[in-house]
A protein has these predicted regions:
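Short helix/strand-capping connector loops at secondary-structure junctions
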Residues: 121-140
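Glycine-rich, flexible loop/turn motifs
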Residues: 4, 85, 128-129
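Short, low-complexity, charged/polar segments at coil/turn and helix-coil boundaries
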Residues: 13, 17-123, 154, 158-164
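Acidic, low-complexity proline/glycine-rich segments
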Residues: 1-9, 112-116
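C-terminal or internal capping secondary-structure element at the end of a domain, subdomain, or sheet
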Residues: 136-164
Length: 164
């Protein structure tokens, strides 16, 4: 009586290859979560009432890094907005006077403008932040477990079927 171990050996080799590629797989999953968080941030910017910023620059400047950062057994990815005023929209700011003037429906900033300017926010008050990044991360974490399981199962099935 004999036993054919060829398929079992192929399966063992496939598992060894998957184990060797695990850093690459985890990187792909984590970067995908960053992309999902960016999509959520853009959706929040688009659908928030009242509108966050009219021009769309704030919405279009959300990005995530294309490489995951490993720290021990955990991974992270950066999600960011590099606009100069992004931090002020995220966390809020003190009310202040802005020199300049109106030309039609557009405010033109001009330092030491003799025509005056406008006061942003309530007098001696605080303009509350919109917390877009915080809300996007919260939305991402709500569905993260199911999304990661689905992606990981798909990746593992592809890699296991590739070798058989």
């Amino acid at each position: 009586m004999s036993v054919d171990f060829r398929d079992l050996i192929k399966w063992r080799d496939n598992m060894a290859n998957i184990a060797a590629e695990m850093d690459q797989i985890m990187d792909e999953l984590v970067v995908g979560e960053g992309v999902y968080a960016v999509k959520q941030a853009k959706l929040i910017c688009k659908n928030d009432v009242p509108d966050i910023v009219g021009s769309g620059d704030y919405r279009n400047n959300w990005h995530s890094s294309d490489k995951a950062i490993r720290n021990g057994r955990s991974y992270k990815v950066d999600v960011f907005n590099n606009l100069s005023y992004a931090e002020h929209l995220e966390y809020g700011f003190r009310s202040h006077f802005v020199p300049g003037h109106w030309e039609g429906n557009t405010f033109v900033y001009q330092r030491d403008d003799p025509e005056g300017g406008m006061y942003v926010g309530p007098y001696k008050g605080f303009v509350r932040g919109r917390f877009v990044l915080r809300r996007a991360i919260k939305r991402t974490k709500i569905t993260q477990e199911a999304r990661l399981k689905r992606k990981l199962n798909r990746i593992l099935q592809e890699r296991l079927n590739r070798g058989l």
